[in-house]
Amino acid sequence: MADEAKQRKTSTAHEKAKAAARAKRLERAKRKPKTKAKSGAKKATAQGGAALSKTTGGHDAARSKAPAKGRNAGRTAFEGQREKQAKAAGKHGAAPSGTVKKQAGARSRSLDEREAAAFAGFGEDAPANRSGLSCPVERACGACQLLGVPYAEQLADKQRRMEELFGPLADEKTAFCPIEGMESPLYYRNKVMSPYAPGRVIPQDRAREDMRRADRGNEAARDGGRTRHDRREKPRREILCGMYAAGTHRIIPTDECLLENQTAKRILLAIRQLMPKFRIEPYDEDALEGFLRHAIVRVGHESGEVLVTLVTNGERFPGSRNFARELVKRCPEITTVVQNVNTQNTNAVLGHEGERALYGPGFILDTLCGLSFRISSHSFYQVNAVQTEVLYRRAVEMACLSGGETVLDAYCGTGTIGLVAANSAADVRVIGVDNVASAIADARENAAHNGVENVEFVTADAGAFMREMAARGEHVDVLLMDPPRAGASEEFLRAVAALKPRRVVYISCNPDTQARDVSVLKDAGYRLTAVRPVDMFPHTAHVENICALEG
């Protein structure tokens, strides 16, 4: 009787559990369409945004996302301008001839969000390839969203986007200059990076491991599981290198890329080939084990010098110099090989735990706008040298320097634009300001290396520095500014209004935040005189833009 009561009790408990499970399934089914659509939209935007971040190369690690739009009644005029400009730019996300539908009730989004959503919307309904260029993994890796669009159409669409974005801020005298495209818009990225990770078990090792497991199982069965086995080597796995798939950390193997320098790509593949010989394990970011995390190759456009940085999960690197010599033997273009240590569980590629040269001087030199620049693993240097020279020369031209002016280079970084300006006219005085001490150290070294004496570099917040200059009654003729993707802060723009430079030349990698800031400067008494886009990253939706303003 006790057993029967126990069985009835157990049966009742099972029935209750089944009923509860059915109720949960029904509840999930009711919510499923709404939840799926919402999460899908978020996923698409996230994937597109990650792909877009990848296309902007040298900027992506140093620049942060724009702050979210203000929605409260008490938001500042500065935040309101951001929303107004996003609405004015409403429909530029799609690739030329592409179709991207806007969801009903969707808020106006920033230019980068629209571009990301446009790319994420590609798939079965992607525009037909009309450029004659193709890549077997272009839809998977997301590095070249517009590869199938003829280059002339890409330029025309980017030009139209800038005219529509800045049109409301212009007057009848504002010059909309034609976009500066590339003559040869392929293989232009002179900084190429690849992660290294373990892939599938090599087939012959898989078969060998299966046989070992079977033998161990048979032995264990014979002695009741008491047999202990010696530790054996793990089966070998493929080594993956290439690009991350859009919005993921899944590596898409690529032996060639139409955007990346071919020498750099060949070196990355040579590293993969040498790793088994030197027993170098690729880093597994899930297990947090392995040794080689990334390799970064920088190629000097004018000099042809090559810097290879190996990012390792630990300092101890047995046979490191032999590895470097063998790599140089296979790729004689290499000038120097550097080991950078990063043991942190982070998405940051380069570490700050130590660095040493395994071969060569540990840096390379390259020429830009007639000046020589020293480039190390941590140096900021634009990834498209051809268009960088165009960008800087146009910016200095728009500054209209005739001699004797005082120029303030805000967000100066390693001093490239300021040095070009200092070298462009007689008796020009240039002051470069940046809050990153290491960048200022590089800027001073670049000035000394080039013998440029009419420039000084200061470690300070640019906005605070300008406010102090205004308080002392000092005068600036021209302000050069190249802020991060988030644009200038409200405090910085107030400082510009207080200092009142006669001319402002604003370089931006994010025209949406640039338009917002230009609108604020316009309210402070400045007039937009010229807009000049530069196509720094062909076959992507990204646009670099220069605005000139006069007060």
Residue spans of the language-model regions?
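Intrinsically disordered, Lys/Arg-rich low-complexity segments
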Residues: A2-R114
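Terminal, basic amphipathic appendages of nucleotide-handling enzymes
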Residues: R71-R75, Q81, Q103-L147, G225
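Nucleotide donor/acceptor-binding cores
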Residues: N190, G304-V306, G404-E405
